[in-house]
Amino acid sequence: MALIHYVMFKVKTPGERPAVEQLFQEEYSQIQMELPKVQSVVILKNCVDRASNFDIMIKMKLADEDTLHAYLEHTIHRRLMKITGGLAEMVGGFDCWESELNPDC
């Protein structure tokens, strides 16, 4: 059963958003190549400018919970956390089983 992993990221400085988006595109593409059980990665940009919104959301489909742990411990993920840590105002995560998603939503 696939696990869906979400990461929400809000930049401290709006001008940094394009660079962070580009970094995520490049690095998550590499993660997907190095971890075959990462089935898909989608980087989404917020389209409504509200103070309470996050700027970027990453949606990952992972083969199982072991893949989540492998991703969290992966060198690229650890490096991204260091690089973006100072750029983040807020970061949030959420995990659910794919079977719990409502296809009509």
Model-derived regions: residue spans:
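Short, flexible helix/strand-to-coil boundary loops that buttress conserved ligand/catalytic motifs
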Residues: 72, 81-84
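Short S/T/G/P-rich N-terminal loop/turn motif that feeds into the first structured element of a domain
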Residues: 1-55, 63-73, 96-105
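A cross-taxonomic marker for long C-terminal extensions/tails that follow the last structured domain
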Residues: 83-91
